[in-house]
Amino acid sequence: MPYYFIRVGGETGHNNPNELISYVKNEPPTYPKKRFNYYDYCLKNSIIRIGWPDVGDLAKGGRAGALANLYSLQSVKPHINKYLLDFYHMPLKSIVLMPNKDIPGNLYVGEVSGAYEYYHDVPRDPYECAHRRKVAWDKDSHGNPKVYRAADLNIGILGGWWLRAFHEIADSKITDAIDKAREK
């Protein structure tokens, strides 16, 4: 079973109801600070999401769709191309870790429970989070999303893949620690 790390942050201006180009219906209004982390929205709605909506729907079918997506994917940097394709192809039941940027070192863990979705009704520019997956988040005894500490999962929070938008976790020390923590 694969394990992934995902950051779900975005700019507050991306959802300003006073600026029609960046407003997304049914999403929260502007947030209290720049670079607000959308983790709370993702937890409440059982999703993970990443940006680059201008690439378009990665599930668009047929030859025309494949060519359009290929052109769009070639327009982004190679590492972003990899993020998007890995996110799209992430198998069901994959384990995902999402950091809480308001409390460094806190993480939420969940299991991918739904296929890739692209939200066509979100503005493409400048909104960043059109690519989404459903997630069943681990819950504590009160039914709230369970908080894990990075240190307990053998994860260092400085540098490396912690700074990336999306990354597969291949280190068996980390994946074993995640499995042990989830059993408790």
Predicted regions and their residues:
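Contiguous surface segments at macromolecular interaction interfaces
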Residues: 1-47, 126-184
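Structured alpha/beta reader/binder surfaces that contact nucleic acids or chromatin modification marks
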Residues: 49-138
